[in-house]
């Protein structure tokens, strides 16, 4: 069977960039020895740093380096010449807005991709790495453009498809009293990963309209001296955090509630769902830090359960970054079937929540009403996260 021809539109292509850890699976195959049904035929790089890898890889693997996005999709002709597009707008040097959001050119990438679709009268599946865009306005525009042009679209983080320790999938229709997600890192860049971890779990809860997610009514970012005050008002939240803490192996000394508020980029996102569920995303920077498997943890309390459900979203890193192979498998499924393995609406929602959280922080913790997020509706997918053995990390001597 012919492999699907793929154009990749990336901000930059250097070692360990998202372009590298995703596209390596198309060029060299998966860590388990398998290969996706895709081949990279063209590449557009928005920036070319001194440590760029793409030019040497193009010589080795035979894909074309293109000077425009349109050229990457048409290979210089008048017709669409690819079966799918990977838009990887992550890493590189781009400005920030006043709220601290990095203005990666994800909307511009998608607009130029869609311009080719409109001109040629053809659309193919598009994967958008991470959140759709920094701002809700841009994200919603992209979503509506995809619907208008009937573009099969997948987006988001590798967190929902990575390994879980212990393996945990909440049963469809379970009743939740509350949920928390613990994460680390830059509030926007890694806060998004934490939100994706939260959402991929709690979207399986019992919902009034036959299992259909109904969206979010308000978001608040708590930080500084007030960081833990709201969280500690809910006994179930403390119980869930107490269940997570034994899983965390790598952290600073001292009490999490005393240490984390001192960090400038530590915060807790409070997410209020339309059906009444409340969840917290805890980012205790200064206390929690990255090490083996990353540091993303989920906990939820099911109604009537004796103990909370708890797991770590385990990231295999550094090389071969096998969790990105799992994300590539989800992308490949869409390219082969024209159907995303899980709804892009999940990431539309997490994008909107993240933007609201960043706005709340910019406005000194003001609660943000989110009427625009109340009508994002979708049903949870049965796409399975990573199973089986986790590949061993490969380290150069200098990295050991």
Q: PLM features: what roles do these ranges have?
A:
Residues 2, 100-102, 333-400:
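C-terminal helix-rich "cap/oligomerization" subdomain common to oxidoreductases
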Residues 82-89:
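N-terminal Rossmann-like NAD(P) cofactor-binding module of classical short-chain dehydrogenase/reductase
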Residues 251-346, 397:
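NAD(P)-dinucleotide binding in Rossmann-like oxidoreductases
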């Amino acid at each position: 069977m012919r492999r699907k021809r793929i154009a990749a539109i990336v901000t930059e292509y250097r070692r360990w960039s998202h372009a590298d850890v995703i596209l390596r699976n198309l060029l060299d195959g998966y860590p388990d020895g398998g290969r996706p049904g895709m081949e990279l035929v063209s590449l557009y790089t928005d920036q070319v740093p001194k440590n760029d890898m793409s030019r040497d890889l193009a010589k080795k693997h035979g894909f074309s380096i293109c000077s425009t996005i349109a050229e990457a999709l048409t290979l210089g002709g008048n017709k669409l010449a690819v079966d799918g597009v990977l838009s990887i707008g992550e890493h590189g040097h781009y400005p920030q807005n006043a709220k601290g959001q990095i203005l990666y050119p994800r909307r511009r990438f998608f607009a130029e991709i869609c311009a080719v679709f409109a001109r040629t009268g053809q659309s193919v599946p598009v994967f958008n790495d991470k959140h759709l865009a920094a701002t809700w306005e841009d994200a919603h525009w992209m979503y509506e453009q995809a619907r208008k042009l009937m573009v099969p679209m997948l987006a988001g983080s590798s967190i929902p498809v990575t390994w879980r320790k212990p393996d945990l999938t909440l049963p469809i229709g379970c009743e939740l009293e509350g949920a928390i997600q613990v994460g680390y890192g830059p509030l926007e860049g890694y806060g998004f990963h934490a939100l994706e971890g939260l959402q991929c779990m709690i979207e399986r809860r019992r919902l009034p309209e036959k299992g259909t997610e109904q969206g979010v009514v308000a978001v608040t970012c708590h930080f500084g001296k007030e960081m833990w005050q709201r969280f500690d008002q809910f006994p179930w939240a403390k119980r869930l955090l107490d269940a997570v803490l034994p899983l965390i192996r790598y952290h600073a000394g001292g009490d999490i509630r005393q240490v984390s508020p001192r960090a400038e980029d530590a915060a807790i996102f409070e997410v209020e769902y339309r059906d009444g569920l409340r969840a917290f995303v805890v980012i205790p920077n200064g206390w929690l830090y990255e090490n083996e498997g990353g540091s993303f943890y989920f906990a939820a309390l099911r109604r009537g359960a004796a103990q909370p459900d708890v797991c770590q979203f385990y990231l295999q890193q550094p090389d071969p970054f096998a969790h990105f192979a799992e994300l590539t498998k989800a992308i490949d499924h869409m390219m082969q079937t024209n159907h995303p393995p899980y709804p892009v609406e999940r990431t539309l929602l997490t994008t909107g929540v993240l933007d609201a959280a960043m706005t709340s922080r910019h406005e000194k913790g003001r609660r943000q009403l989110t009427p625009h997020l109340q009508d994002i509706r979708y049903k949870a997918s049965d796409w399975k996260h990573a199973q089986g053995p986790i590949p061993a990390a490969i380290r150069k001597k200098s990295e050991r």
